[in-house]
Amino acid sequence: MADIFDRLFSLQGKTALITGAAGGIGRVLAVALAEAGATVGLHDLTLAQLTESIRLVEAAGGRAVPLTANLGEVAACRQLIADAHAALGRLDILVNCAATNRRKPIDAVTAADFELISAVNLRSIYFLCQAAHPVMQAQGGGKMINISSINSFFGLGSVSVYGLTKGAVTQLTRVMAVEWAKDNIQVNAIAPGFMATPLSQPVWADPYKAEWLRSRIPQRRPGQPDELVGALLLLASTASTYMTGQTVVVDGGFLAGGSWVEDQ
């Protein structure tokens, strides 16, 4: 049994770069990549933010390569790929996990809000992948994994900019998959549901919102970041060599539908 799992899911000898590696989801995914055998480039805004992620990757027996960049700047995105390639020697896997949000109704969103969320959540992914493409092309292939959101698939108040950026990431994933399939590069996305992370903490801390969500999630609870690891390892490994342009939804059944109140 171990042989088939190793053959399909092992990342031994692979290198990966994950952005937003200090965040709630990014840190867990970074450790999972290391546990699967990859050398992991850990990105965030500052080295201080990465201290705990580095410790956890090394505790898992992995090698961590810390990298910093302000993903709000296109030049910094391109430089991050160059730095990662130089430090890692090659780039087999790119995981775009960095994200930000400001919860406001549309009427309260400022141009600065729009620019920040769009730059981090969408523009950075576009130019990180653009810069990574020739690197992966030259080495014979690779894996790009974009962290999208179930907000790609339904409307929710007060997250208009976040939702549109994640919807765009889902579509961008398809287009990149089509353009780069000839280079043996698989581009896929993961769309988490309502997860228990620092970014979503204000939602779960609100009793009304928390109860509203639980009543609509068939599994009746928030997801945990480590429940995204299975999807990550599928998309990062040889188990998904004929899978590209897809968005894997991990949402406790939220998008599948709900129950009548009396059935809950």
Language-model-detected regions and their locations in the chain:
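Short C-terminal tail/terminal secondary-structure segment
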Residues: 2-7, 154, 233, 244-264
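Canonical Rossmann dinucleotide-binding motif of NAD(H)/NADP(H)-dependent dehydrogenases/reductases
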Residues: 10-41
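C-terminal substrate-recognition "lid" of short-chain dehydrogenase/reductases
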Residues: 88, 126, 141, 222-250, ...
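Substrate-binding pocket helix/loop in short-chain dehydrogenase/reductase
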Residues: 105-106, 113-115, 213
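Active-site helix of classical SDR
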Residues: 129, 165, 173
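Alpha-helical segment proximal to the catalytic Tyr-Lys
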Residues: 134, 178-182, 241
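Residue(s) in the substrate-gating loop at a strand-loop-helix junction
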Residues: 149
